[in-house]
């Protein structure tokens, strides 16, 4: 028996230990919602300073911490136990099969044994009441199990070496706290969701690192306010979006330790009735420092006015540019939220921006300046809110008739203003989801649809021609003349109609007066009234299909730009002709027996009778993006057969139900992020409200700025509920969160014919755009990239060969020069050698006379010597 005790003690329980408290560090962080936001707008924007009510009192925090400390189980206490008694089977003296063991100190185990070890299903109860039910592997709690604490708290999920590790859920009994997600070594780590109340209205879902909120996550506070973005050390830190539903405000941008810091966008939503006079929101886009507007930034007012300049502690201070609601501009210095030099200008300034101040305007020496700037001294019958820009049109008439022309056309606009407002509101809402403040802003895409519905293009003008006409009077970058994301205010919409009316009908009324009035009246009579509200094309006909089609819009815009070419007409902006469109489809290998060139022409000419009459075709007209995109939607039904859709009938349910649909404003914001900072900042008040008109979206949307916005947005990560498959589910009840295990329910497709038709349409769209068009574009771009790489490689190789040839040639030249130098040197040596004998002989010839004496004397000596001998 002693031997059994030692074996059970040494082998069995040295590594098993109870986990630490699952409620440790529940993180009722002060940064979750009590940051006071000092966001008072000097122009009557509601006060932002408020405390969110999600933070627990300090006393509660202490109680929670005490409860946490009271349930810490970090020590390995099983190694101190000795088996006192055992009931069950034995094999060769070792515990085997099902049995019950009691240990010294009061701990017990009931379950399966194998070779003397706790192995298999079992229940271990500590002396203090903590209970573990689940799997054991050689005396160690492993795989799946349930911990139950004496106070009623419980954990169910994966266990590794006695620690919570993997996926599991925890529910605290002393506090209304529940967590479901991933664990590592007994701590929340990975993706998980924590609920702070029984109702499930206060929660956090996202990334955890060692019990700390860190990474990407969504925090919903008890008040309903929501933060979505990056976290660091339990605080909002990085890129994120906060929506204050209680005050109808939203901030998207940079955070540092729970406070707005860096570049961001703050929007104030105002509830309005339908057909409100002002379709915009009060919005600030710029730099923040410690929650204040500080640095460079733009403030867009709901009236259409805009301030672009420097800010200091929420006040305009420094150089700035103020655009009034009528389009007039003041540019100069500001001091302490006033125009420099006019310290008593504040009340008039607020009044002229149509922001309620609660104080009646008072006269001052600056009133005359304001009347000139905001147009209140103007005698226009349209009032100061709308000022028609007729300078270019009036220049076409003699100066003597210009006042009468202007007056009569203003009367004409005034008579039709109600109908024009209704038209503007109707078309600007196409393709848009729910608006938080019941307002919509027209984009160029909506405007094109209006022009085609009213048959403006039947007057020998394409939509591209109209864009060029309308851009002549605006400082619009060349690459944005045909952008579908350009926004259009009501006053801009009216100005556009007047300019187009003149270009279409001026020849007919050039000899009659008032000519401009007659042009506009005929435009209203023959084009607008009979045809407005009758939506043609296949993009905006049905709301649900429109929202789904928008999900493909950004990629199609990218493809459209890739195949545009400079226009032949000034200012030579990039456009796409019909022949370019057809060539593109041919390159994509999409021209086949289903989609022939003739079918292509029929689809394009369906809304334009001047392109194709059944015999002759005109491939020269330019296509704007609306025509390009609607043609692709039509091609989807032609190219995709029933056999192709059969293999794609299981489109995700979220796509079918519309949960992932994008509105035109969501796409507009995404497009603005892709623009260069210079392009974005160059917009004036009529074209720079891309972000201000967006509807609520589940995606993190950031506004761009020079050297401020990060190039990479945090990616929207999958929620924990999407990751667990047939593991653990939970539901909200009146008493809190109930956890249960079940199989995932399969999505059942409704049997209704209308739903079936819509599902078929969705499948067609998916097959055509994702599997056909986008795949072909990707393949073509890969080929082009390979060609470019090959060309670069060939160029580099040619340059390398040229360098090698040049080097070889240089070496040969050097060798030849050296050879020539050597030959020349040898030649000089030979010449020197040849010259030396000649020099010697010549020297001998010169010295001959003296040598004659020398030659004679020896002979005389010999003669004399002979005489002496004799």
UniProtKB/Swiss-Prot annotation:
Annotated MORN repeat ranges: 86-108, 109-131, 132-154, 155-177, 179-201, 204-226, 227-249, 251-273, 284-306, 307-329
Keywords attached to this entry? Cell projection, Cilium, Coiled coil, Cytoplasm, Cytoskeleton, Flagellum, Repeat
Does this UniProt record's set of keywords contain Coiled coil?
A: yes
Stretches of the chain forming a coiled coil according to its record:
784-811
Source organism, top-level taxon: Eukaryota
Biased composition range(s): Polar residues: 17-39
Indicate where this protein resides in the cell: Cytoplasm, Cytoskeleton, Cilium axoneme; Cell projection, Cilium; Cell projection, Cilium, Flagellum
Disulfide bond positions:
none
Gene Ontology CC: 9+2 motile cilium; cilium; cytoplasm; cytoskeleton; sperm flagellum
Which residue stretches belong to region Disordered? 1-43, 674-704, 840-870
Low complexity bias: start-end ranges: 693-703
Basic and acidic residues bias spans: 1-16, 683-692
Does this UniProt record's set of keywords contain Coiled coil? Answer: yes
| PANTHER family given in the database record | RADIAL SPOKE HEAD 10 HOMOLOG B-RELATED (PTHR46613:SF1)
Q: What does the annotation say about its assembly with partners? A: Interacts with RSPH6A. Does not appear to be part of the axonemal radial spoke complexes 1 or 2.
Known role: May function as part of the axonemal radial spoke complex 3 (RS3). Radial spoke complexes are important for ciliary motility.
Designated name of the protein: Radial spoke head 10 homolog B
Tell me which species this is from. Answer: Homo sapiens (Human)
């Amino acid at each position: 028996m002693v031997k059994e005790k030692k074996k059970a003690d040494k082998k069995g329980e040295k590594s098993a230990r109870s986990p630490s408290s699952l409620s440790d560090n529940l993180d009722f962080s002060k940064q979750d919602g009590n940051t006071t936001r000092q966001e008072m707008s000097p122009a009557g924007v509601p006060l932002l300073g408020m405390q969110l009510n999600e933070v627990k009192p300090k006393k509660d925090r202490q109680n929670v911490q005490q409860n946490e400390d009271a349930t810490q189980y970090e020590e390995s206490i099983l190694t101190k136990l000795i088996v006192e008694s055992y009931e069950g089977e034995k094999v060769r003296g070792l515990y085997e099969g099902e049995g019950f063991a009691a240990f010294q100190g009061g701990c017990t185990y009931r379950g399966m044994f194998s070779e003397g070890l706790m192995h298999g299903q079992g229940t271990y109860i500590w002396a203090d009441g903590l209970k573990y039910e689940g799997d054991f592997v050689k005396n160690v709690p492993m795989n799946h199990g349930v911990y139950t604490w004496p106070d009623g708290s419980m954990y169910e999920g994966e266990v590794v070496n006695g620690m919570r590790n993997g996926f599991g859920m925890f529910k605290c009994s002393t506090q209304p706290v529940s967590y479901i997600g991933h664990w590592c070594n007994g701590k929340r780590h990975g993706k998980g969701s924590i609920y702070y109340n029984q109702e499930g209205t206060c929660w956090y879902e996202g990334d955890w690192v060692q019990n700390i909120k860190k990474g990407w996550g969504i925090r919903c506070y008890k008040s309903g306010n929501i933060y979505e973005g990056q976290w660091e050390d339990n605080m909002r830190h990085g890129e994120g979006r906060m929506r204050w539903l209680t005050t109808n405000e939203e901030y998207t941008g940079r955070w540092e330790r729970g406070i707005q810091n860096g570049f961001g966008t703050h929007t104030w939503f105002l509830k309005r009735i339908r057909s409100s006079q002002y379709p915009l929101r009060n919005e600030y886009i710029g730099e923040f420092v410690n929650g204040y507007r500080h640095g460079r930034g733009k403030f867009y007012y709901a009236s259409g006015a805009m301030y672009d300049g420097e800010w200091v502690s929420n006040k305009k201070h420094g150089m700035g540019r103020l655009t009034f609601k009528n389009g007039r501009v003041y540019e100069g210095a500001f001091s302490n939220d006033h125009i420099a030099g006019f310290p008593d200008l504040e009340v008039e300034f607020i009044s002229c921006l149509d922001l309620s101040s609660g104080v009646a305007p008072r006269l001052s020496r600056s009133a005359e300046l304001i009347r000139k700037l905001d147009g209140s001294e103007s005698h226009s019958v349209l009032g100061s809110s709308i000022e028609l820009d007729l300078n270019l049109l009036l220049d076409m008439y003699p100066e003597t008739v210009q006042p009468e022309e202007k007056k009569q056309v203003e009367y004409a606009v005034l008579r039709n203003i109600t109908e024009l407002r209704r038209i503007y509101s109707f078309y600007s809402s196409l393709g848009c989801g729910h608006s938080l403040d019941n307002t919509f802003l027209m984009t160029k895409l909506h405007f094109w649809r209006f022009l085609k519905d009213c048959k403006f293009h039947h007057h020998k003008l394409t939509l591209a021609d109209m864009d060029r006409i309308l851009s002549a009077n605006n400082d619009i970058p060349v690459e944005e003349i045909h952008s579908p994301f350009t926004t259009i205010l009501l006053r801009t919409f009216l100005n556009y109609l007047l300019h187009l009316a003149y270009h279409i009908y001026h020849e007919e009324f050039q000899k009659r007066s008032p000519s401009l009035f007659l042009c506009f009246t005929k435009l209203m009579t023959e084009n607008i009234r009979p045809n407005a509200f009758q939506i043609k094309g296949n993009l905006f006909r049905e709301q649900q299909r429109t929202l789904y089609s928008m999900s493909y819009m950004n990629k199609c815009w990218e493809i459209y730009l890739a195949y545009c070419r400079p226009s032949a007409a000034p200012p030579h902006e990039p456009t796409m002709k019909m022949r370019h469109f057809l060539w593109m489809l041919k390159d994509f290998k999409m021209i086949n027996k289903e989609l022939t060139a003739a079918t292509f022409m029929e689809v394009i000419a369906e809304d334009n009778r001047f392109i194709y009459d059944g015999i002759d075709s005109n491939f020269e007209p330019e296509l704007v993006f609306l025509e390009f995109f609607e043609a692709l939607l039509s091609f989807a039904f032609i190219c995709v057969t029933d056999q192709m859709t059969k293999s794609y009938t299981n489109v995700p349910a979220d796509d079918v139900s519309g949960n992932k649909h994008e509105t035109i404003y969501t796409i507009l914001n995404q497009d603005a992020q892709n623009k260069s900072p210079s392009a974005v900042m160059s917009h004036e008040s009529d074209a720079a409200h891309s972000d201000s008109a967006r509807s609520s979206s589940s995606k993190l949307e950031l506004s761009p700025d020079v050297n401020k916005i990060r190039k990479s947005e945090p990616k929207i990560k999958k929620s924990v509920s999407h990751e667990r498959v047939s593991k653990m589910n939970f539901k909200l009840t009146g008493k809190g969160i109930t956890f249960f295990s079940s199989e995932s329910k399969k999505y059942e497709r409704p049997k209704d014919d209308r739903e079936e038709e819509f599902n078929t349409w969705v499948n067609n769209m998916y097959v055509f755009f994702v599997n056909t068009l986008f795949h072909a574009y990707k393949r073509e771009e890969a080929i082009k990239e390979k060609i470019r790489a090959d060309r670069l490689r060939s160029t580099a190789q040619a340059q390398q060969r040229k360098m090698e040839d040049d080097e070889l040639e240089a070496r040969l030249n050097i060798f030849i020069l050296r050879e020539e130098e050597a030959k020349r040197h040898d030649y000089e040596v030979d010449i020197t050698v040849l010259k030396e004998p000649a020099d010697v002989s010549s020297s001998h010839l010169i010295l001959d006379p003296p040598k004659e004496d020398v030659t004679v004397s020896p002979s005389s000596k010999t003669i004399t010597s002979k005489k002496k001998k004799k």
